[in-house]
């Protein structure tokens, strides 16, 4: 069993490197079969990312968010299950460490 492939999907407030992070979805999977071994969804206090970490909001991306479903737009609403940015990144790191084999980890994602 090869648990070293990690798929990450990040929702942000823009497409640039300085955009605030809204949420992170991560899955550990087998590259050959596509079987998912573990998955996690982490909501982030994106406004805190803006205030403390310098995250930016892109006008075009904001317009995109406004045009999404009510469920998608709800991701932007502050709630108790959102984590501070540093805690969210630590949770992501711990999830990957817990579920991946001891060897190299291969991270997969689609760029904007």
Can you say where each PLM-predicted feature lies in the sequence?
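Conserved non-catalytic scaffold segment of RNase H-like nuclease domains
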Residues: 2-6, 11-109
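Catalytic and binding regions of secreted/periplasmic enzymes and modules that target cell-wall glycans
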Residues: 112
């Amino acid at each position: 069993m090869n648990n070293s492939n990690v798929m990450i999907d990040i929702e942000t407030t823009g497409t640039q490197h300085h955009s605030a992070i809204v949420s992170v979805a991560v899955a550990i999977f087998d590259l050959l079969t596509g079987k998912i071994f573990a998955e996690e969804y982490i909501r982030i206090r994106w406004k805190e990312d803006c205030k403390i970490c310098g995250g930016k909001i892109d006008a075009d991306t904001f317009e995109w968010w406004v045009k999404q479903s009510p469920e998608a737009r709800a991701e932007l609403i502050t709630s108790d299950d959102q984590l501070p940015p540093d805690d969210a990144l630590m949770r992501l790191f711990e999830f990957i460490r817990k579920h991946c084999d001891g060897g190299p980890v291969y991270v997969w994602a689609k760029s904007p």
